[in-house]
């Protein structure tokens, strides 16, 4: 697996993709990118605004373009948005252009980690747990489909998880 130079992190909201990705990039001396942050940078607006104005479909179009662009780079760690795997094109980019690491977490951990985060448009509802359960049903099989490595993130620090990823990848 070490012949692929890019590492792409996939997984649900609250799995720790951005935090773990930063640690991983630093430890491996790679460039770190976050697809959501890149969308915000390109649009000059936050994700919630993009959802409000363009809807989820507009956001997903932007996300696909950003991930297509970023996965063409070499020597990066990319934290993807939780829903990015819904796109067959994105799954293909990720699988073909790097090592895909699925950061797995429980619904309980997701709720705990995201409950105060107002930047997550899909969770601004009365019952976010129900939304997370529904998303898990449809997305978890897609994460598993493209994963080269699966790492559980519950009850571990980001640094510990980053070290586990490095060990599993043989870097």
UniProtKB/Swiss-Prot annotation:
Provide the primary localization: cytoplasm
Q: Where in the cell is it found?
A: Cytoplasm
Q: What is this protein called?
A: Shikimate kinase
UniProt-listed InterPro entries: P-loop_NTPase, Shikimate/glucono_kinase, Shikimate_kinase/TSH1, Shikimate_kinase_CS
The protein's organism comes out as Shewanella amazonensis (strain ATCC BAA-1098 / SB2B)
Q: Does the keyword 4Fe-4S apply?
A: no
Please give the catalytic activity noted in the UniProt record: shikimate + ATP = 3-phosphoshikimate + ADP + H(+)
| HAMAP family per UniProt | Shikimate_kinase (MF_00109)
């Amino acid at each position: 697996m070490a012949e692929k130079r890019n590492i792409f992190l996939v997984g649900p909201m609250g799995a720790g993709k951005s935090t773990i990705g930063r640690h991983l990039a630093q430890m491996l001396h790679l460039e770190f990118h976050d697809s959501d942050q890149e969308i915000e940078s390109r649009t000059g607006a936050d994700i919630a605004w993009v959802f409000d104005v363009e809807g989820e479909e507009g956001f997903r179009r932007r996300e696909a373009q950003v991930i297509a662009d970023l996965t063409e780079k070499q020597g990066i760690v990319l934290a993807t948005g939780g829903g990015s795997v819904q796109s067959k094109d994105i799954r293909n980019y990720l699988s073909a252009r790097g090592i895909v690491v699925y950061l797995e977490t429980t619904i309980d951990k997701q709720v705990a980690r995201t409950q105060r985060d107002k930047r997550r448009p899909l969770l601004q509802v009365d019952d976010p747990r129900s939304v997370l359960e529904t998303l898990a049903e449809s997305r978890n099989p897609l994460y598993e489909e493209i994963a080269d490595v699966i790492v559980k993130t519950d009850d571990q620090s980001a640094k510990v998880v980053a070290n586990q990823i490095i060990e599993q990848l043989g870097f």
